[in-house]
Amino acid sequence: MMKNVLLIVVAALFIASANAQQHRIKVACIGNSITYGYGLPDRTTQSYPAQLQKMLGEPYQVKNFGKSGATLLNKGHRPYMQQDEFRRAIDFAGDIVVIHLGINDTDPRDWPDYRDFFVKDYIELIDSFRAANSKVRIMIARLAPIADRHPR
């Protein structure tokens, strides 16, 4: 799964680099524990944002703004937009924003009651990044599947 996300992101970023100016292209990776690198022996080198930085090299500045347990839903149990990582990502004003959020929203505390807000909250998140950088390119990563024996 992570390999597919990386390949898609790398391909899109190379296309974006054709239009890049002389400055380093800033890439903000937004997400939950998958983005953060939770459970990895060394998330600073093994998380997908760290791997993406290695693959893209010096013309890019990739930053990890993942927050373990984060939800996309603003009424979820840990709304991403209420986290420090979100504020830092907005301040970073990425040229490209990769969003991988939504898996924690399937939690029974969130989805049954708030699922109708999912699209609205996604648009609000995207609009926040557009307000920080009107020329930002937004990429939404496909969610990792939940195993069939997972309690959700």
Model-identified regions with their sequence ranges:
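Residue-level detector of functional hotspots within protein domains
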Residues: L6, L13, Q82-Q83, E124
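A short helix->loop->beta-strand "cap" motif at the edges of active sites that frequently abuts
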Residues: A132-I138
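Bacterial Sec-dependent N-terminal signal peptides
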Residues: M1-Q22
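Carbohydrate-associated surface elements
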Residues: A144
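Conserved SGNH/GDSL esterase-like catalytic core that processes O-acyl groups on lipids
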Residues: H23-A28, I34-K120, A147-R152
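Hydrophobic positions in alpha-helices of CheY-like receiver
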Residues: L125-F129
